[in-house]
From Swiss-Prot:
The keyword Protein biosynthesis applies. SUPFAM superfamilies: Anticodon-binding domain of a subclass of class I aminoacyl-tRNA synthetases, Arginyl-tRNA synthetase (ArgRS), N-terminal 'additional' domain, Nucleotidylyl transferase. This is Arginine--tRNA ligase. It is an enzyme of class 6 (ligase). It comes from Leptospira borgpetersenii serovar Hardjo-bovis (strain JB197). Monomer. PANTHER family: ARGININE--TRNA LIGASE, CYTOPLASMIC, ARGINYL-TRNA SYNTHETASE.
Length: 586
């Protein structure tokens, strides 16, 4: 057993060695042409792992899959140190049941050694950008999902040896930010007694007239939080004085620009506090404004022009994004000379490349899928390999209360924030929120059941895991933590004990595979199955430590120590606490 191998890799290696022996009698068959893989058994009664090797390669071997399976089983059965049992089931699946003694040995060298996770051979420097919400308001529920998953992805990648920088991109430049400032200014003037009106969607009134007449733009922000910000600004003496002066001088555009800056900073502070309460810390906050101020945005267009990827039409400069799968070529500089958001985004990713990242991963919202090909194309144009840039789409979140959807809308002011959700869920808001957001694959919409999230029984999947951890801690408070690997080796192995040992031993490979696939939900799914295996063990005959003989107690305690470690580490990677005591254990 090598230190850096998962149990699955060990079994696969044994299978490959078995295939080497098998194909000696097939001189015309090259091993490289064979499909050799293993997977978890779909039904635990057949074993721990299985392979469909015989079915997938029977044509190439020109032999019946059942006959191939029989020959392979005969070879692999000789590995009695690793396998308790190797057999096959028609039409040609070979099943592996791992020896309990091997499981115990593996657990000692991995789970109980303090170094739980195999490390990658070549660690990468990775930039992982997520959340990156516009600074136009507090973080919403979709951002909360991205925050929980992005932070967990970073933890998983770090666990297997990569160097990861978590980055938040601040869109603090452009028309939406200006409209945010205009919206705040409207509320300030309302507070000071001025009358305001709201622009209709089809109204084409010029912006200077809108500012002069104190009109809230159709695309402005109407949430109550804008009024709160306006009041806060007026309560700051220095800013209040600036506001008073500029209003008297009727310098509305200048004041709107100032309000944009102030409101953005207020919202960023709000967002950081929300993220902190959610246990999410970023290594870098990168401002879009710095790209424009340093002329990096227009500079990257020249890079694209040099390689022939820009053409002009009607005074616009257009990127040939259709060459990379986009449905049409995209404008990067408008006919008035202003760069589009796409060009700024290309400049931002060029900056990432120049910072020396081996991999660039972005998590985007549900309405950005069509944006991938054009940005990926630009990144390739800049000389970055396509496979080293990856975009993960975080799909929509539906909040459900009593089975009904709860509506969300930022501009209309009727939306639920991350802060609202954490507060709604009470003192367990962080743990419950983070776990619920990683329970499902990011590429699928998530129905967030508020009723289940508030349930503090073990029907709630978060509490189910935490109760399991607290239960083990309670056992150790009762009988002590003394344990023995030798005593564990001497235990009579019931099915419940063997099942739990296998689920413990799976932990490193589950983390390794989840990190490599960047799928945090796999950890959540694994932990649920693990806790189920522990519950079966806990309720099983002769597994109560307090009732066991001293020797059996030492062996069972060894298994429980490993189980506690898996739960604590697994929950920690998701950003969920593992309490030693719970008010209710049911």
């Amino acid at each position: 057993m090598k230190e850096n191998e998962t149990l699955k890799q060990i079994v696969l290696k044994s299978l490959e060695e078995g295939v080497d022996s098998l194909i000696v009698s097939f001189p015309d068959v090259e091993k490289s042409s064979l499909r050799i893989k293993i997977e978890y058994s779909r039904d635990e009664k057949f074993g721990d792992y299985s392979t469909s090797f015989s079915l997938e390669n029977s044509k190439l071997l020109k032999r019946n899959p059942i006959q191939v399976s029989k020959e392979l089983v005969e070879i692999l059965q000789k590995r009695t140190d690793l396998f308790e049992k190797v057999d096959f089931t028609p039409p040609g699946f070979v099943n592996f049941k791992i020896s309990p003694s091997y499981l115990l040995e593996y657990i000692e060298k991995s789970i109980l050694s303090g170094d739980h996770f195999p490390k990658v051979e070549h660690p990468l420097k990775i930039n992982l950008e997520f959340v990156s919400a516009n600074p136009t308001g507090p973080l919403n529920i979709v951002s909360a999902r991205a925050a929980a998953n992005g932070d967990t992805m970073a933890s998983l990648l770090k666990a297997i040896g990569h160097n990861v920088d978590k980055e938040f991109y601040i869109n603090d430049y452009g028309n939406q930010v200006f409209l945010l400032g205009v919206s705040t200014l409207v509320r300030i003037r309302e507070i000071k007694g001025e009358f305001s009106t709201r622009q209709e969607a089809d109204d084409t009134t010029p912006i200077d007239t809108i500012l002069e007449k104190n009109i809230l733009p159709a695309e402005g922000y109407r949430g109550e939080y804008i009024k709160d910000i306006a009041n806060a600004l007026l309560n700051e003496p220095k800013k209040s004085s600036q506001i008073e002066t500029l209003l008297k001088e009727k310098k509305y555009r200048e004041l709107a620009e100032l309000c944009s800056i102030w409101t953005v900073e207020n919202n960023l502070d709000w967002q950081r506090k929300d993220l902190d309460s959610f246990g999410v810390e970023f290594d870098n906050y990168f401002r879009e404004r710095t790209l424009h101020e340093s002329d990096k945005v227009l500079a990257v267009m020249k890079d694209l022009e040099r390689v022939g990827k820009i053409f002009e039409e009607d005074g616009k400069k257009i990127f040939r994004s259709t060459e990379y799968g986009d449905d049409k070529d995209r404008v990067v500089v408008r006919d008035d000379g202003r760069p589009t958001y796409l060009l700024a985004d290309i400049a931002y990713h060029k900056d990432k490349i120049e910072r020396g990242y081996d991999r660039i991963y972005d998590i985007w919202g549900p309405d950005h899928h069509g944006y991938i090909s054009r940005l990926s194309g630009a990144v390739q144009t800049l000389g970055y390999k396509k496979e080293n840039f990856k975009v993960i789409i975080s799909q929509q979140v539906n909040l459900l209360e009593s089975g009904q959807k709860v509506k969300m809308s930022k501009r209309a002011g009727s939306f639920q924030t991350m802060s609202d959700l954490i507060g709604f869920l009470g003192k367990h808001g962080k743990d419950v929120g983070r776990y619920f957001f990683v329970m499902r694959s990011l590429d699928a919409p998530l129905d967030f059941d508020l009723d289940l999230a508030q349930d503090q029984s073990d029907k709630n999947p978060v509490f189910y895991l935490q109760y399991a951890h607290a239960r083990i801690c309670s056992i150790f408070r009762e009988v002590g933590t003394e344990s023995s690997a030798e005593a564990a080796e001497s235990l009579e192995m019931s099915e419940e004990r063997k099942r739990l040992l296998f689920w413990i031993a799976r932990f490193p490979e589950e983390i390794f595979d989840s990190a490599n696939s960047m799928e945090p939900h796999r950890v959540a799914n694994y932990l649920q199955s693990f806790a189920k295996a522990f519950t079966g063990f806990y309720l099983g005959k002769n597994n109560r430590l307090k009732d066991a003989t001293p020797e059996v107690r030492l062996g069972l305690a060894r298994i429980c120590l490993a189980a506690r470690s898996v739960l604590a580490e697994g929950l920690g990677l998701i950003g969920v606490s593992a309490p030693e005591k719970m008010e209710k254990e049911s």
